[in-house]
Amino acid sequence: MSGYTASVVGASGFTGGEVLRLLSGHPEMAVTQATSRSYENKTVGSIHPNLRGMDLRFSSPEELESVDVLFACTPHGVSMEHIDAFQDAADTVVDLSADFRLDIESQYDEWYDGHNRPELLDKAEYALPELNRENLPGADIVASGGCNATAAIMGLKPLFDGDILGGGEQIVVDVKVGSSEGGAGGGEASSHPERSGVVRPYAPTGHRHEAEIEQFLGTGVSFTAHAVDMTRGASATCHVYPEEPVSKGDLWSAFRESYEDEPFVRLVAGGSGVYRYPEPKAVAGSNYAEVGFELDPTNKRVVVFSAIDNMMKGSAGQAVHAANIALGIEETAGLEFAGLHPVGAP
């Protein structure tokens, strides 16, 4: 019997299904409840066909069971509305939405539609374990980082850690994301006939994850997001212009110093073969992030690359990683598996 009990609220969506998949093989956590308003009493496998062997039915979110950890896989606005019920049911709440990622109420006024529980913002711990794992043990509310923000922050973090960037430089972030980012509900733009074959700018400016990136790097960024023809993945290409000259040796040192002890980060910079730089296809289905860089001395530019599976490192995998740390479990538990290769068309 696993040592900790878990419930998944909003379990019929893509992120909820991914959390269920991870917990189904977790050595220390067992799912005792999965909720869905739309599919109450239906088997989990009837909605998530990859989980047909899971002996669990969806229950009502109005009847939450007492558990050690609750994963809230709900749309923006739901967790802040129901956080009291979530906390009554669980010692630790891991929220996969944006409801508790930002620090202050004014940020929600600017980037979202306000916040109705601002008194809880300073009690929630942002979860990108490579950034702040020391804040997670014993946390009551864990706000799992967003997929686009995670991709960008993972790539840029070593440049700040290594004092290559100080905060006043120009930073341009271009992220390309898969269709699963739109969720199971999707929409016209996410349907196969509309999505197939596209490289579509959908947030040239003003993407909400820009606030998340700026908050945790402490500097402004110019952020653009494109929808592309893949199901899973987020690929960030970041263009930065350091004020002082930078060598490849400086970059290698900075990235190794930041990530050499990180269990879910791989440094991929040049080399030979097809996969010479980070690519979402190489991490599909896993909690790994690949990061890399290239130097453009002619234009005094550093190009940084980061690739994640938006459903894993950008969502469910990161949430389970954070929950492991919050509960005092070995942080890699249930996540130490490679991605899928080859991966076919979306």
UniProtKB/Swiss-Prot annotation:
One of its GO terms (molecular function) is NAD binding. Keywords: Amino-acid biosynthesis, Arginine biosynthesis, Cytoplasm, Lysine biosynthesis, NADP, Oxidoreductase. One of its GO terms (cellular component) is cytoplasm. It is found in: Cytoplasm. GO terms for biological process: arginine biosynthetic process via ornithine; L-arginine biosynthetic process; lysine biosynthetic process via aminoadipic acid. Its EC number is 1.2.1.103, 1.2.1.106. SUPFAM superfamilies: Glyceraldehyde-3-phosphate dehydrogenase-like, C-terminal domain, NAD(P)-binding Rossmann-fold domains. The keyword Cytoplasm applies. It catalyses: [amino-group carrier protein]-C-terminal-N-(1-carboxy-5-oxopentan-1-yl)-L-glutamine + phosphate + NADP(+) = [amino-group carrier protein]-C-terminal-N-(1-carboxy-5-phosphooxy-5-oxopentan-1-yl)-L-glutamine + NADPH + H(+); [amino-group carrier protein]-C-terminal-gamma-(L-glutamyl-5-semialdehyde)-L-glutamate + phosphate + NADP(+) = [amino-group carrier protein]-C-terminal-gamma-(5-phospho-L-glutamyl)-L-glutamate + NADPH + H(+). Pathway: Amino-acid biosynthesis; L-lysine biosynthesis via AAA pathway; L-lysine from L-alpha-aminoadipate (Thermus route): step 3/5; Amino-acid biosynthesis; L-arginine biosynthesis. Pfam families: Semialdhyde_dh (PF01118), Semialdhyde_dhC_1 (PF22698). NCBIfam families: argC. Involved in both the arginine and lysine biosynthetic pathways. Belongs to the NAGSA dehydrogenase family. Type 1 subfamily. LysY sub-subfamily. This is Putative [LysW]-L-2-aminoadipate/[LysW]-L-glutamate phosphate reductase. The lineage of its organism: Archaea, Methanobacteriati, Methanobacteriota, Stenosarchaea group, Halobacteria.
